[in-house]
Amino acid sequence: EHRYRANLAAKGPQVKLGNDHEYAKALENLIVKKRYSPSAALAAIRNGKKSFRTSICPRTLYNYIANGVLACEKKDLPLKGKQKRRNRSRKEQIQKRVSCGTSIEYRPAEVDHRVSFGHWEMDTVYTSKKDRLKPTLLVLTERCSRQEMIIRMRDRTSGSVVRALNALERSMGAAKFSKVFQTITVDNGSEFSDFEGMEKSALRKRKARTKVYYCHAHRSYERGSNENANKLIRRHFPKGTDLSKVSVQQVAMVETWINDYPRRILGWKTSNMIFRPWFDRQ
């Protein structure tokens, strides 16, 4: 427990942390308990209200971790490096177009360029690709702020997706939902096959609540924000996690963690810092 205290003393005055044990403890807590990357941990401290005597850069923090100065190790850090590509069979590569919805080619340029709020990407995180009847997470990522909404569904079917959006619309109200969810971009998975059900308002008869666009097959980069968000979710629910044993409360905690996580692409601000002021004005 006191190993890094001894390491601090052994390193001598050249260790910038010096005797600022409170700062060291705050960094350890963010990295080990809250699962932040070193850069995100430093940003969270800068964004916070509490001030410390010391301030270090990411490279210094990584060196401290590598040299055992702090009570955290490399295993506490997010995995880095490229993952091995799976050698997919021909059967896996063929993805049938399951909808007659609107192609991403017709999506407005302002959505592509992320110049305005209200445009989302949607995906699912699940336990088994083969079993569509197991509990699934519906993941929505706002393209401008990277704000995350995660909804636990009973299965990975188009009916459950429509029901989840209906519940979200009822909780917000029809007018606010239409402002917040102006467009939603999805892949060609069968859970997103009911584009009419997803677009149609549950509260206003014969009126649309959003516009759904479909990506090209095998182009996950067209939902890049979704893909990155899914990696953050997998820090908490690794592949193979039985989502039937994951509670709604646990899902909500992960959603909050993601939205409070400082991101490099946001200038080390959090999604909540960027999204909430806009959302509250709608």
Show which residues each predicted segment covers.
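Acidic/histidine-rich, metal-coordinating catalytic segments
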Residues: 175-194, 216-218
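Active-site beta-loop-alpha junctions of metal-dependent nucleic acid enzymes
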Residues: 130-133, 150-175
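Short, basic alpha-helical/linker "hinge" immediately adjacent to a nucleic-acid-recognition surface
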Residues: 1-33
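Mobile genetic element proteins and their domesticated derivatives, centered on retroelements
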Residues: 27, 41, 61, 123, ...
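Charged alpha-helix within mobile-element recombinases
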Residues: 21-34, 45, 170, 189, ...
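DNA-recognition alpha helix
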Residues: 38-52
